Amino acid sequence: NAEQSQRALKKYRIFFAKLLTFNDVEGYCQPCLSPIWDTSLGGHALMEAGLDIGEKTLQAATDWLAERQILDVKGDWAVNHPDLQPGGWAFQYNNDYYPDVDDTAVVAMLLHRADPERYKEQIRRAEIWVIGMQSKNGGWGAFDIDNEYYLLQHIPFADHGALLDPPTADVSARCVSFLAQIGHGMEHQSVRRGIEYLKREQEPDGSWFGRWGNNYVYGTWSVLCALNAVGEDMNAPYIRKAVEWLRARQGADGGWGEDCAS
């Protein structure tokens, strides 16, 4: 009825207003909130800074993340793997039908670092789901398996191929890093296939493209982290080429950054 419609519209206006950000010269609308991603990266940063797991701040963060693992809903990903047991995390609040392996790997790595015994079951379910989401070519897409219908990219409104979710180096690197952290080396089929995929994806200049961040700097450091985690020879020529490429992109102020145009 009209009254219910008005209440719903008011609710959605408030929601969308939260996505708007303004400063003195411009404004923009972010597409969504990212609490899972932000909390897990924040937790990693706190651990790198030496915060003990017993600290209430970190304990609250890891417990909050553990409670949000999607264990009972088979989302859109199940179309390509209906028998796979759920076990991922989503990027946003309450998005049970679209967990992604990138968030899942980062969260599971944090839980493993913080307290592998306390979060043993969450890590186990994440491992099963991440391995099950690996594509035939050895890589991982963010949300789907073997989503490589490249003909769709020729549709005029496809926007850099965003209609698809093919395997990418950045996401694949995160999955390899997770599997390496929980004890799987090159003897593990998923890790071995993932590394082979990453080697094939390296650009001629030594870099890797990262789809979910800007762009080659993001992809390259992500892959280098994975190669280091899995125990690759960091003096191997292909790795040194990537390192030199990354060093050459350092800015005059000492930082790294990359324009979206790349």
Q: What are the residue ranges of the model-derived segments?
A:
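Preference for long, amphipathic alpha-helical scaffolds in soluble/luminal domains
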Residues: 1-262
